[in-house]
Amino acid sequence: MDFIPGSITAQTTMHFLPGWKKQGLSLPTADEWAYLCGGGCRTLFPWGDGLDYSMRLRWFEDMDEDENRPYDMEEPNFFGLSIAYDPYMREVVQADRLTTCGGDGGCNICGGLGPFLGFLPCSPHCKPEVQEDNELNGDYDFYRPIIRLENYD
């Protein structure tokens, strides 16, 4: 099966999984993804239950041309992961059906709902989204293979 950008499907996902398994990799489950995203915190976002409106947020703030740093949400969390920092980007997780976490494809932002509701899909507590049409967008959807430590005694 050839990989065609913009046409990632459940079948494409199934195509990659055996190769990852041979390398000791797999996709996180939705619960594992939420734990990784939250950095072990029990709040709505890794930094607390509200949105700090002084943060520089992608899609709402432009960086000055001389600034060579990531947007605030792109900074690594307590686990050192840059995860769930862009509401347009969704991560495929391991599930019985094609499921994503970490974004809504930008629906809330494009719908004009503002920064808080725009970034709410990036919360580790946002419900995983089953992709009913079994299709993913190659520009916004991606995989984060993980190594399960239980595999290494």
Segments the model singles out, each with a brief description of its role:
Residues Y140-Y152:
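Short, structured beta-strand segments at or near domain termini in extracellular proteins/domains
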Residues P28, N134, D139, Y143:
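Single, functionally critical "micro-switch" positions that shape active/binding sites
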